[in-house]
Regions:
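P-loop NTPase motor domains
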Residues: 2-179
Length: 181
């Protein structure tokens, strides 16, 4: 759940990270109808709470992990919070907990390869969403430094098959372009 404080020139990095985590939770919890308004509100509140320590002191060891969000959800009074936490449990302490840690990938390298081939069916969509978030963080950091970023994606059809992931990606990309009448 890394956060780049230069995530956007226009929007709050925390708002964008909350939007990402809402997309993540929508994949996990949402079902066909997606997240309900109360669920979105609870998740947004918990995201703001879980990132507070990092925003006060932005050090790598303060970056929250999914387990921190899970813990804060369990502390909330709404029954929806408990349902969301229960849905996240398999990704926090269950058999699909591969993303419940700080990243071990050095994304500062000039060339980074994300390989999600070995992720099982249950994790592939989440893996694609996380990769898109990491790439976006790198693009914004490079933009702040005046550097171009080249992004090559093999198996693009996997991204195109997933409407929610593609929607999240497109929303971020299109926000950077101006349309002139």
């Amino acid at each position: 759940m890394d956060i780049n404080l230069n995530y956007s020139e226009d929007e709050s990095p925390l708002s964008l990270k909350s939007d990402f985590i809402l997309s993540l939770c929508e994949l996990i919890v949402g079902g066909r109808e997606g997240l309900q308004p109360i669920e979105k509100t609870v998740i947004d509140r918990c995201v703001r709470m879980v990132y507070q320590a990092y925003l006060n002191e932005p050090r790598p060891e303060n970056v929250p992990i999914l387990g921190d969000l899970h813990r804060i959800l369990l502390e909330q009074p709404e029954k929806e919070a408990r349902l969301i936490a229960t849905a996240l449990e398999i990704y926090v302490s269950g058999s699909l907990n591969v993303f419940n840690h700080r990243t071990n990938v050095n994304i500062q390298n000039r060339l980074v390869c994300f390989d999600i081939k070995e992720l099982g069916k249950q994790l592939k969509k989440i893996g694609m969403l996380i990769v898109q978030d990491q790439v976006w963080g790198r693009v914004t950091a490079n933009r702040a430094d005046g550097r171009a970023t080249r992004y090559y994606m093999d198996e693009m059809h996997l991204l195109l098959k997933e409407g929610r992931i593609l929607q999240t990606y497109a929303k971020r990309e299109l926000a950077n372009y101006q349309v002139f009448d």
